[in-house]
Amino acid sequence: MKKIPFLIMLLSPAFVFSQIKIGVKAGINFANITDVSGFKKDSRTGYMIGGYIAPGTKKLLSFRSEFILSRQGYNYKTATNTGNVNLDYLLLPQLINIKFSKLIQVQAGGQVAFLLNAKVDSTGSGGGSLFDYFKRFDYGLVGGAEIFPFMGFFIGGRINVSLNNANEEAPIGGSWPNYVPRVNAKNNVVQLYAGWRF
């Protein structure tokens, strides 16, 4: 009888783990910022890689937590040069997962993001850090869908819409790079990815 509690203690982590689904994924970003003045901007292709953890439930509704490394930003053209701005974020989405069938799932929710790096690659001034010109914290809404064609493999797409301004406020009359927004600009990202669910 004394062995029973010991066996329960040993088997409990395995039971809990069996009730949790883990997934990994990687893909491409089509990133841009909202309308700005002072320069022409265009969408930029980046990458995303990350994973998620979710309860292994068969219910219609469930929750999912993710962590994603995401390269975003934009291409730009001014009167004097062209280049691209790379904004690297750690995204932490918290999602409601709606399971329509074994093949199709839809996710929606919110996310917070932390800026890890900000750099420019310019024809006029070479490369350099832009970390002081962009906010360290972002937040917004996300929504998308995933298809599970076979086994644990899945493909998906998602739209990320930021609600916070990506750039810091430019000082009145002060110097400011002509390829960094002076007014409120927000990140917009479309993600396409593939992954595996364990």
Where are these regions (language model features)?
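Residue-level signature of outer-membrane beta-barrel architecture
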Residues: 53-55, 98, 114, 147-149, ...
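Flexible, solvent-exposed loop segments that connect beta-strands
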Residues: 33-41, 71-88, 116-136, 165-185
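Outer-membrane beta-barrel channels and translocator barrels
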Residues: 17, 56-60, 101, 150-152
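Outer-membrane beta-barrel "beta-signal"
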Residues: 29, 146-154, 184-198
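Residues that define the transmembrane beta-barrel architecture of outer-membrane proteins
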Residues: 20, 41-47, 86-90, 135-141, ...
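Transmembrane beta-strands of outer-membrane beta-barrel proteins
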Residues: 22-26, 63-65, 106-110, 143, ...
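Bacterial Sec-dependent N-terminal signal peptides
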Residues: 1-25, 194, 198
